[in-house]
């Protein structure tokens, strides 16, 4: 088995990638700003990064921030990986980074190009939005009495555990270049997703679609962020877990945790 470094290994995706790789018998190092012994800020680089990649066969690069710094972080990581003789760099990107003119997407696309031109063996996987991100957007919109959502926009949310499994498999294999995109099992309109969220959460809100302006909105409305098939595009992969299944499992987990907490408090009181 190989030694694999996972950047952003304590995050939503990186944590699951780490668990999957360890379950498959790989030696895994977790790099994040606060995880010892490889606590490294990739935007700064430095000797800590060199120690983290020393003796590593493969790097799975999950660390990312919409607040900026991804390109600088990737340059530092690639430089250290080349110096250490890393064999394979796996990068997780987003479906639509070349179709939707959003600042964060432009940064992800720039990192893709850095990876491709790194001189390392490389693999790039693009995935659609995680269920968790769509949920956060809907929860934010539901803070108002009326849920205001961009008109005419659909989404294709995917289960993060399925993305993690795909990344782990790619990390264990030979460099493959740009691989087929991974999207969720269903393309759904935002109002449809919102109504599913309201139904499972037991909340009541009026859902209203609002036309917006700008290139990013036009890109999302045109479906540039969805997995494309046919018309000369490579066939994309699809996850299996639907948004309703994600919401239901999350609600059931919260219910079990609540019951366990109440039982614990009752036991202590008795």
Question: Each PLM stretch: what is its role?
Answer:
Residues 16-20, 80, 114, 166, ...:
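Rossmann-fold NAD(P)-dependent oxidoreductase module
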Residues 2-26:
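N-terminal Rossmann NAD(P)H-binding glycine-rich loop of SDR-like oxidoreductase domains
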Residues 26-84, 94-100:
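NAD(P)H-binding glycine-rich loop region in Rossmannoid oxidoreductase-like domains
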Residues 65-143, 155:
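Glycine-/Pro-rich loop/turn segments that contact NAD(P) or position catalytic residues
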Residues 128, 149-160, 183-186:
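Glycine-rich "substrate-gating" loop/helix at the edge of Rossmann-like oxidoreductase active sites
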Residues 198-256, 265-270:
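A hydrophobic C-terminal alpha-helical subdomain
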Residues 132-138, 170-180, 203-205:
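Glycine/proline-rich active-site loop of Rossmann-fold NAD(P)-dependent oxidoreductases
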Residues 160-167, 182, 190-193, 246:
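Non-catalytic, hydrophobic alpha-helical segments
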């Amino acid at each position: 088995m190989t030694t694999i470094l996972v950047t952003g290994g304590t995050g939503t995706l990186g944590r699951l990638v780490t668990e999957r790789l360890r379950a498959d018998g790989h030696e895994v190092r977790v790099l994040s700003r606060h995880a010892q012994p490889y606590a490294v800020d990739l935007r700064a680089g430095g000797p800590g990064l060199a120690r983290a990649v020393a003796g590593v066969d493969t790097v799975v690069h999950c660390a990312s921030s919409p607040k900026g710094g991804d390109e600088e972080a990737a340059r530092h990581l690639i430089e250290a990986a080349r110096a250490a003789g890393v064999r394979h760099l796996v990068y997780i990107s987003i479906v639509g980074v070349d179709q939707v003119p959003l600042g964060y997407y432009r940064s992800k696309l720039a990192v893709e190009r850095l990876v491709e031109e790194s001189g390392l063996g490389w693999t790039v996987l693009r995935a659609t939005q995680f269920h968790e991100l769509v949920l956060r957007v809907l929860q934010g919109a539901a803070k108002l009495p009326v849920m205001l959502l961009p008109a005419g926009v659909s989404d294709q949310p995917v289960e993060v555990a399925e993305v993690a499994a795909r990344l782990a498999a790619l990390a264990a294999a030979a460099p493959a270049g740009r691989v087929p995109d991974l999207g969720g099992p269903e393309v759904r309109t935002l109002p449809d997703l919102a109504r599913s969220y309201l139904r499972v959460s037991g909340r009541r809100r009026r859902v209203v679609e609002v036309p917006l302006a700008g290139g990013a909105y036009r890109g999302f409305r045109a479906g540039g962020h969805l997995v494309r098939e046919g018309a000369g595009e490579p066939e994309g992969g699809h996850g299996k877990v639907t948004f309703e299944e994600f919401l239901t499992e999350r609600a059931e987990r919260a219910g079990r945790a609540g019951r366990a907490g109440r039982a614990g408090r009752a036991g202590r009181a008795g």
